[in-house]
Each structure stands twice: as structure tokens, then as C-alpha cells.
UniProtKB/Swiss-Prot annotation:
Name of this chain's protein: Uncharacterized protein C11orf96 homolog
Residues with PTM Phosphoserine: 73, 87, 97, 113, 119
Compartment list: Cytoplasm
Highest rank taxon of the organism: Eukaryota
Organism: Felis catus (Cat)
Main localisation: cytoplasm
Keyword Cytoplasm annotated: yes
Keywords linked to the UniProt accession: Cytoplasm, Phosphoprotein
Free-text tissue specificity from the UniProt record: Highly expressed in the kidney (at protein level).
Keyword Transmembrane helix: no
Modified residues (Phosphothreonine): 56
Length: 123
């Protein structure tokens, strides 16, 4: 009996060209996917130059003004202004009440800390 190489005893193929019998069944169990002959759609197409994608039409200042002036009635403008002022007032009140709550909380904490220090000194 010929001496086997250490790698062959463990079932490891020592030569890249030799195929061990137990590896043949793996090829049947897990076949390699067949590659398509064509390239996929995304890679086969020629791309447009990106520079043209970012170009825009020139716009004059007069055109912008016309767009802003169209369709805005004075009544809608007044409603928007009133709504904006109302939301500002609501925001002001909420921040004011929050600051009052903070002041009350900090004064309450200060009072409690002073009370506890007084009781400690009384002992």
C-alpha cells in the first residue's frame, strides 16, 4: 500500500486537477447558475452625458414675478397673514408658559433644598 499524503487522508485535494469523489456530489446538489449570453439592460445601454441632465432653462426676473402675482387674491393673502399672526401668538404664549413653569419648578426645588438643609442643621 502506497503512503498517502497527509492532505488526502483528511479528504483534502492536494492537487488542483484531481477531483475527490465526495466533491462530485456537491456539484450535483448545488449546480452553478448559468450566465445569460446577453448583458443586462442597465449595463448594455450607452449612457447619456451627465452634463446635459443638469442644464436648466434660463429664467428672467420678470417671469418669476409674474408667477408669484398670478392667482393670489387679497382675501387669500389676508387669511394667510391672519393665520400666520395667530400661530406666532400661540407660539409666544406657549414659550411664555413654559418659562413660567421652569421658574416655578426651579423656585420649588430651591425651597425644598433650603428646607432640607435647615432640618439637617437642626439635628
Amino acid at each position: 500500500m502506497a503512503a498517502a499524503k497527509p492532505g488526502e487522508l483528511m479528504g483534502i485535494c492536494s492537487s488542483y486537477q484531481a477531483v475527490m469523489p465526495h466533491f462530485v456530489c456537491l456539484a450535483d446538489e448545488f449546480p452553478q447558475p448559468v450566465r445569460p449570453a446577453k448583458l443586462s439592460k442597465g449595463k448594455g445601454r450607452l449612457r447619456r452625458p451627465r452634463q446635459s441632465r443638469f442644464k436648466t432653462q434660463p429664467v428672467t426676473f420678470d417671469e418669476i414675478q409674474e408667477v408669484e402675482e398670478e392667482g393670489v387674491s387679497p382675501m387669500e393673502e389676508e387669511k394667510a397673514k391672519k393665520s400666520f399672526l395667530q400661530s406666532l401668538e400661540c407660539l409666544r404664549r406657549s414659550t411664555q408658559s413654559l418659562s413660567l413653569q421652569r421658574e416655578q419648578l426651579s423656585s420649588c426645588k430651591l425651597r425644598n433644598s433650603l428646607d432640607s438643609s435647615d432640618s439637617d442643621s437642626a439635628l
